[in-house]
A protein has these predicted regions:
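Carboxylate/His-rich catalytic cores and anion/metal-binding grooves
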Residues: 1-47
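Beta-sheet repeat architectures centered on beta-propellers
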Residues: 14, 19-22, 41-221
Length: 221
């Protein structure tokens, strides 16, 4: 069948390549393989052609994180720029990533802990790099958050931070930080002028600092 041909019963021959089955979760296409969730939802397999056996193979790529996938896989997505990464959300709200470079035999999984539970993940093209967007339920409030794709471009101590749901505020001699309604009643970590300060509880959408600062980041722990 050519690329511009029409599919008919007489010109298509579909052969069974695997008896494992798959979940109704969008498969991911990489440069050399297809990634799919096996029926049952607790394993991710490659679907790739093996020239040695002249047949399709479906090896498991999640052997080392089976304990994290017991609740099942809810969604997955892929970024390719600057590095190829597979993103996975589980039914119990975990966010996992996998540095995936099949040609170099690299399959490296990591967990990204955060307060609340992650419900979904999606990726989009960005100007500097592919963007990762997630839906997070934090204490009964759902919000859409984006991973900072330019985080590793900022290595200055004063502007670097490793925080979730963060709000950055700049000014001269700041003592009252507002706009923290999404952190109401929660313990907020404070990173000001390159130093970690004592945590505070968000009240009426704001926190008060003991000492003035020029750059402040607050985050839900």
């Amino acid at each position: 069948l050519s690329a511009d041909g029409t599919i008919t019963p007489s010109n298509v021959n579909v052969n069974l390549q695997s008896a494992l089955g798959s979940e109704p979760i969008q498969v991911l296409r990489t440069e050399s393989a297809i990634l799919l969730v096996e029926r049952g939802g607790t394993k991710i397999r490659e679907f790739v052609f093996d020239f040695a056996t002249q047949s399709y193979q479906s090896p498991v790529v999640t052997q080392l994180i089976e304990h994290l996938l017991r609740s099942g896989i809810r969604a997955m997505a892929r970024t390719a720029n600057p590095e190829q990464t597979i993103w996975v959300v589980t039914n119990d709200g975990l966010l996992l990533s996998c540095s995936y470079r099949r040609e170099e035999e690299v399959i490296a999984w990591a967990q990204h802990p955060t307060s609340g539970t992650v419900e979904s993940v999606s990726t989009n093209y960005g100007a500097a790099a592919d963007e990762v967007w997630i839906v997070v339920d934090r204490y009964g409030t759902r919000r859409v958050e984006r991973l900072d794709v330019e985080h590793w471009e900022r290595i200055e101590v004063d502007t670097s931070y490793h925080l979730d749901a963060a709000k950055v505020t700049t000014g001269d001699g700041l003592t009252v930080i507002t706009g923290l309604d999404h952190l109401e009643g929660q313990l907020v970590a404070v990173h000001a002028d390159g130093a970690d300060l004592a945590s505070r509880v968000g009240v009426a959408g704001q926190i008060t600092l003991t000492d003035p600062a020029d750059l402040v980041v607050g985050v839900l722990l």
